[in-house]
């Protein structure tokens, strides 16, 4: 893994499209060797620390970065490549560090390349407001986490994961619980902390939306998972129950908002809020089943949401509008693209036999054990999720052909390759050891 990080760092030194593509093509097969590992936690060195979910997220990061470069092959600006490469390196390091302070630094540094992608390659003047919302929400929410990490260091003398788990006894302080978790709940995000996400997605370029939805949101899920396992660990505080309930009700509300959207990118962004709320609820339930559900949902959502933004961009290039009022009848002209719309809409609604389906199915026993009311909420979420996914597919591809469609040719082969590359991992990554607890 150390070699992978060094190779990732070398990309930042030579931010050229060809060099970056060759390096990623070499790193990704190497990262595959870390996926089928039969351990729960393992140290690789004093600084590098691997877990099954961490290695899966590293593979996801590398894959999404590669697909961003292929999907935006017409942008070969060295500044753009440098932003993506540095973000790729920071995320790889975040998913394999062994202490909370280094993770916090990587967590915050990842905002800089993301902000640059939105500000420099966004489409509209509103990108300034989107960047402001991104920094305001994430930085403000992470300040209590920094203060509490300094308190932990003063108390324990180290911020290493295992040392904190052994020597620190959490006292169920409600304010401390909220302060520790707030940064990750905003990053996921859960409903009520989500306003920055639709704005960032709508104003970001294709590459920014793919990385943001595919990987950056998982940084919040990974941080929450580590926090629960090593600091909070089996807490029975009322705050946990309140956040679980808020997450599920937020997922219901976000799903309803999806049906009301007219902007295709905003619809996909709100669907991310709904799915990541399930991730936060699964992690906070602190059972083996719910942990497995959260991990599977994170990985599956990474590929699905990234592909949906690719499809939204391809449809935008044909219509020159993101409005669902104008984006109609594409099946008659672009049947192959409509086929991919159907596949990824099914994955977004968690239809079998995809990883999305297994992830959402496994959370049902945990919901039932916790409370039958939570199970009812989960069923409502799954029902509405199917509704807005079908609504999105039917609106874009069926009906009378829109009057504003521009004359254009069929999709290029590279577009099909990008979409297929998003599709395959959700079937290939059904490895039991990958999601072990």
Swiss-Prot record:
It catalyses: a ubiquinone + NADH + 5 H(+)(in) = a ubiquinol + NAD(+) + 4 H(+)(out). Its EC number is 7.1.1.2. Pfam families: Proton_antipo_M. It is a multi-pass membrane protein. InterPro entries: NADH_UbQ_OxRdtase, ND/Mrp_TM. Keywords: Electron transport, Membrane, Mitochondrion, NAD, Respiratory chain, Translocase, Transmembrane, Transmembrane helix, Transport, Ubiquinone. It comes from the Eukaryota. Signal peptide: none annotated. It is found in: Mitochondrion membrane. One of its GO terms (molecular function) is NADH dehydrogenase (ubiquinone) activity. One of its GO terms (biological process) is electron transport coupled proton transport. One of its GO terms (cellular component) is mitochondrial membrane. Core subunit of the mitochondrial membrane respiratory chain NADH dehydrogenase (Complex I) that is believed to belong to the minimal assembly required for catalysis. Complex I functions in the transfer of electrons from NADH to the respiratory chain. The immediate electron acceptor for the enzyme is believed to be ubiquinone. Belongs to the complex I subunit 4 family. This is NADH-ubiquinone oxidoreductase chain 4. It comes from Albinaria caerulea. The gene is ND4.
């Amino acid at each position: 893994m150390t070699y992978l990080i060094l190779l990732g760092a070398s990309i930042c030194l030579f931010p050229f499209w060809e060099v970056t593509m060759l390096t990623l093509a070499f790193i990704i097969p190497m990262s595959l060797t870390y996926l089928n590992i039969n351990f729960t936690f393992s140290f690789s060195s004093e600084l590098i620390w691997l877990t099954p979910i961490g290695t899966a997220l590293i593979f996801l990061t590398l894959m999404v970065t590669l697909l961003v470069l292929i999907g935006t092959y017409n942008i070969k600006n060295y500044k753009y490549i440098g932003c993506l490469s540095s973000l790729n390196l920071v995320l790889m390091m975040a998913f394999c560090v062994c202490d909370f302070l280094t993770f916090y630094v990587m967590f915050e540094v990842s905002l800089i390349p993301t902000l640059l992608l939105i500000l420099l390659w966004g489409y509209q003047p509103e990108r300034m407001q989107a960047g402001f919302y991104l920094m305001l929400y994430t930085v403000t929410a992470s300040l209590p986490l920094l203060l509490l990490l300094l308190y932990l260091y003063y108390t324990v003398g180290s911020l290493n994961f295992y040392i904190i788990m052994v020597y620190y006894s959490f006292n169920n302080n409600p304010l401390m619980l909220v302060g520790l978790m707030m940064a990750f709940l905003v990053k996921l995000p859960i409903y009520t902390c989500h306003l920055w996400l639709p704005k960032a997605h709508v104003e970001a370029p294709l590459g920014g939306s793919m990385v943001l939805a595919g990987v950056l949101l998982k940084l919040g899920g990974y941080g929450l998972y580590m926090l629960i396992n090593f600091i909070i660990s089996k807490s029975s505080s009322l705050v946990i129950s309140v956040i679980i309930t808020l997450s599920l009700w937020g997922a219901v509300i976000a799903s309803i908002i999806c049906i009301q959207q007219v902007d295709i990118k905003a619809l996909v962004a709100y669907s991310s809020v709904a799915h990541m709320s399930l991730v936060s609820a699964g992690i906070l339930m602190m059972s083996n089943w719910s942990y497995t559900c959260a991990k599977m949902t994170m990985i599956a959502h990474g590929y699905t949401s990234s592909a949906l933004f690719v499809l939204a961009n391809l449809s935008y290039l044909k219509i020159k509008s993101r409005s669902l009022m104008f984006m109609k009848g594409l099946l008659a002209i672009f049947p192959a693209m409509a086929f991919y719309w159907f596949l990824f809409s099914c994955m977004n609604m968690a239809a079998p036999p995809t990883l999305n389906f297994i992830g959402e199915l496994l959370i049902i026993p945990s919901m039932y054990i916790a409370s039958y009311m939570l199970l009812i909420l989960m069923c409502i979420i799954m029902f509405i999720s199917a509704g807005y996914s079908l609504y999105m597919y039917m609106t874009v591809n069926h009906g009378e052909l829109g009057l504003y469609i521009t004359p254009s040719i069929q999709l290029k082969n590279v577009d099909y390759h990008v979409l297929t590359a998003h599709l395959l991992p959700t079937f290939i990554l059904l490895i039991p050891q990958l999601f072990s607890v």
